[in-house]
Amino acid sequence: MPFAVERDLARRALDTARTRGATYADARFVRRQVEDAVVKNGHVDTIDRSDTFGFGVRVVADGAWGFAASQVVTADEADRVAALAVEIAKASAVCKTAEVRLAPVAPATGAFRSPVVQDPFALALEDRVGLLVAADAAMRSVKGPRTTRANYEIWREEKLFLSSEGADCEQTIVETGCGISAEAVGDGELQIRSYPAAGGRTQNQAGWEFVEKWDLVGNAPRIAEEAVALLTAKPCPQDVRTTVVLGDAQLMLQVHESCGHPIELDRALGWEAAYAGTSFLTPERLGTFRYGSDTVSIRIDSTTPGGLGTFGWDDEGVPASEGWAVKDGVFVGYLMSRETAAALGKPSNGTMRADGWARLPLIRMTNVSLMPGDAGSLADLIADTDDGIYMETNRSWSIDDKRLNFQFGTQLGREIRKGTLGDLVRNPTYTGITPEFWGSCDAVCSASEWRMWGTPNCGKGQPGQIGHTGHGAAPARFRNVRVGVVR
């Protein structure tokens, strides 16, 4: 969208904030359009559309933060909101424990647009929903599933950011997601299979071409058949230790929960504890702590094509960047804001994002990815494994408030016997302590198996915000892992 009027209003808000006593101010105008559709058991269950537009002003005054927002986009409202933000900052300063300090950054200027081949909003609604109807019908062609679902989400966000330091940039982010799931019930068991990922959806920064590449209709019968077959599959062994090979879609969530959240510097500093606590990766461990084996390298990269954490600039006007969280097993990097980076005497790597115009930006995962190794294909990795369990597609998880002790359950498991995949395993689970678990990783598949996954539902903050994060991974092997529920 053209931002000519909004740019003038942003400048006005910044001027008002400075006049009222702000030493720093920024203004964000955000328009977000979202459409979700679900087909369930042969019927169109929901088609939801939303369109929101508004602006927020963030300031520092008397050494403290203030923020205010509105969906009334007028000159008078720009003045009112800016003045209110300064008033809130000055009130907050009464009980501040330290002055806000910001790491320096060059003023952001320019424009960024998600690369899109086929605009999902330009496709006829009948065609979008028609694909879901066909995929759902293909699952229902299999005898046995109790419930079938197919869904998509299309998402567009247009943002304008100006700051009192001279930043002036705009961005258009387009995302598309899709998936299918089947549930089967029998003998007190509920089994679920979803594709391509847990929750029946994965999402990337892309157009409708992203949906088409997953071939939902072609994969639908297999997913339904697996859900039914799991009802009579072997149960997961109870409380034993064995080798575990995790599929890349499961590793995506493992990275998210046991690396992505603990490297958020606000958690590590103890400034943030909402939605699952602080972090065991405290600053004195930076650069020396053994997070995993030499095989494990995890990258922070907001430039990765297709990633939900890809952008031109974060919501503080810091440019996209790339670096390491873990390099050859050693913890070396955080996700940082300008304020938290200043606390460590470092430049920000640009990870502050807000959930729309009405919320303050928070440190959020960008694209935090397990980098590929040299173990070849998944078939090669299985062939190199004498005994163990292959697990894929998350079903449940639990992790403590330091991000150390965890348990994950997956939808599907398969025995590994003498280098081949064997019988199905139902209700597979594994548990561990984060550095011990990553320390047991002795193989990661090669780049040909690496894939970028998306998590469009990451919660953080109070009031709560939903973030969109990207996680690349290839299948990997872990030795001496505790599997099965402890009885």
Regions found by a protein language model. Name each.
Residues M1-R487:
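N-terminal small-residue-enriched
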